Amino acid sequence: MRARPALVALLLLGGGLPVAGADDAQLARGLQAIQRMTGCFLVDYSYVEVQALKPGYVRDPRVYDVNRDKSAKEWIVAETISPRRIRLQRVLFLADLAGALRPGTEVRHQSEDWEYDAPFLYDFVAPLHWQPRDLRPTPGLWTRRVTNLDDGLRYQCAARWSEDTAYPDWACPSNYAPIPGRETRDMGRSDYQALDRSTRIVVYGASQGGSWLERQDNVKTIHGDGGRVPLVRELGKNWYVRLPDSECAGGRAFAERRRAFWTLLRETWDGLLDGSGPFVERTPPGQPPRFAKMFDLEDSVLGRDLSDEATRQETRRRILDLIQQYRAP
């Protein structure tokens, strides 16, 4: 799926969008770059610790390499929510090194919301705690919101897409965030609670295959009652190497079957995360993570007609009830 100039032009002209010189150029630059991030990709995640920052800490010599014994692929599809907001929904699945799909590995991965001139974002300020921040004093920014697997909050940052480089890039120098799932799930880490991320995304053109890169220069951070303690610096790269769309047929089918539920889920979260106050989560004792229960809820409504108003409202109520169960009073 290549960038679509006609769609970009439509977004610029539609919805009564104001056009004003530099503002228009930044909007167009971002829209074109974000559309190039869609399609079928081989995804290569690689992370390594490079510098201990806390006295007495011994650097972990292991390299996180997602493709060591398999191939991770993602189908990334765009949903245009408004002329200034695009959602990139990712479906992650695995194949063996010979290229054969591992059945049942398809999973709804993170969503990425990109919004131009967003009025606010939610800063991660402590484990399970996010605080809204007003962005209106600084216009002309693209806000990137990376969600949990169930569209809940993870981390957000606002910056401009470059306008003077051969390939568009978007850089966020400091973005406090929860500990990544790759660390707790795959690396068995529980000795720190947060990651201070420095991210740079570079989107390459068609002559480079239409691939893109996310560079990360992060600080693993202990977050305790005494504040933040830097533990160790890590470097990482997420390469998205474009593949023919046919290699993501399974991920595409997985997404199509669930699109109606995902849209309703996103709309429900939009109603809650309106910037009016903090959002604080909790995990009820003895319960699995919220996303696991949301996956179960999703499976229970597959095949139901969510365009039917009664079914839609019932499903929305179930989503809200589940979110509230994991929300601190």
Where are these regions (language model features)?
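Amphipathic/hydrophobic helical signal segments and adjacent flexible N-terminal regions
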Residues: 22-38, 46-67, 83-94, 125-138, ...
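Short helix-loop boundary/capping segments
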Residues: 139-203
